[in-house]
């Protein structure tokens, strides 16, 4: 395969993903195939987002890292010192992806580090490793292309998380603003009583203690439930089981108390 064919192989994987999130494991496997090296896609904190192995490394520590999908903290921190592609680092480099405790076995091990950058910030690191054969310009072009794609994907995921966060918050704020003053008061007492995200509640007890009617409590719970903020289930004489579904709810409720 020449460089163009290899690039097309990466493109084909991206085109197949069409609109769907790019799978980091698939990305690693494609790069592993075209570059013929072990490939590790790491997040900023050293979480292994995807990997593919070309040459098996028989080493317990490495096996555990792959099983736990986590690279050591110290190693991950040091990667931030590398700000541009660093090819063909040998076994004596602190950045080697080979186990240093087996130096003699991997004395011809070469590692290439490619920073993953997107939106002007460091998002992770792409690590390539193989034995004997040096990484050449063609390999580095493919690796940097792969790192760019991974960077864009991480940014897209981040944007989705921010969007989801904003949506959750808006739903909660709308649900709370739909409550009347007495319903809001009832809800505050209910969640003080629950002291957590789920539990059992006896509506009549709260109604008596706070001095409101039971129907106010029922209405308040119904409004929150129809907004998808909580779920509730009647357990007859035992009371009502309540569970918070939207993790922004208790935070927003807490804010209201301090206003």
Curated annotation (Swiss-Prot):
Keyword presence, Repressor: yes
Family the UniProt entry places it in: Belongs to the CodY family.
Positions of region (GAF domain): 1-155
GO biological process, one term: negative regulation of DNA-templated transcription
Annotated compartments: Cytoplasm
HAMAP family: HTH_type_CodY
Any one Gene Ontology molecular-function term assigned to this protein's record: DNA-binding transcription factor activity
Superkingdom assignment: Bacteria
Keyword terms, alphabetized: Cytoplasm, DNA-binding, Phosphoprotein, Repressor, Transcription, Transcription regulation
Major site of localization recorded for this protein: cytoplasm
Name of encoding gene: codY
Matches recorded under InterPro entries: CodY, GAF-like_dom_sf, GTP_trans_reg_CodY_C, Transc_reg_CodY_N, WH-like_DNA-bd_sf, WH_DNA-bd_sf
Residue positions where Phosphoserine is found in the record: 215
Protein name (record): Global transcriptional regulator CodY
Function: DNA-binding global transcriptional regulator which is involved in the adaptive response to starvation and acts by directly or indirectly controlling the expression of numerous genes in response to nutrient availability. During rapid exponential growth, CodY is highly active and represses genes whose products allow adaptation to nutrient depletion.
Upper classification of the organism: Bacteria, Bacillati, Bacillota, Bacilli, Bacillales
DNA-binding region: 203-222
GO cellular component: cytoplasm
């Amino acid at each position: 395969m020449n460089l163009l064919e290899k690039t097309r192989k990466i493109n084909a994987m991206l085109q197949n993903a069409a609109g769907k999130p790019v799978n980091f494991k698939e990305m690693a496997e494609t790069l592993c195939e075209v570059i013929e090296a072990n490939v590790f896609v790491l997040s900023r904190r050293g979480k292994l987002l995807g990997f593919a192995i070309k040459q098996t490394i028989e080493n317990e520590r490495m096996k555990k890292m792959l099983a736990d999908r986590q690279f050591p903290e110290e190693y991950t921190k040091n990667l931030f010192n590398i700000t541009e592609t660093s090819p063909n680092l040998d076994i004596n480099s602190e950045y080697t992806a080979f186990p240093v405790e087996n130096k003699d076995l991997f004395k011809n091990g070469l590692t290439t580090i490619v920073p993953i950058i997107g939106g002007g910030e460091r998002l992770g690191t792409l690590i390539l490793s193989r034995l004997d054969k040096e990484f050449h310009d063609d390999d580095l072009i493919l690796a940097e292309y792969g790192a760019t794609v991974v960077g864009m994907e991480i940014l897209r995921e981040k944007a989705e998380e921010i969007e989801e966060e904003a949506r959750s918050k808006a739903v909660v704020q709308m649900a709370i603003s739909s409550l009347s003053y007495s319903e809001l008061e009832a809800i505050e007492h209910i969640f003080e009583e629950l002291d957590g995200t789920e539990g059992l509640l006896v509506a009549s007890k709260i109604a008596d203690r706070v001095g409101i009617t039971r129907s106010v409590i029922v209405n308040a719970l119904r409004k929150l439930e129809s907004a998808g903020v909580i779920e509730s289930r009647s357990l007859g004489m035992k009371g009502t089981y309540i569970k918070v579904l939207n993790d922004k709810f208790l935070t927003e409720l807490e804010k209201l108390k301090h206003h």
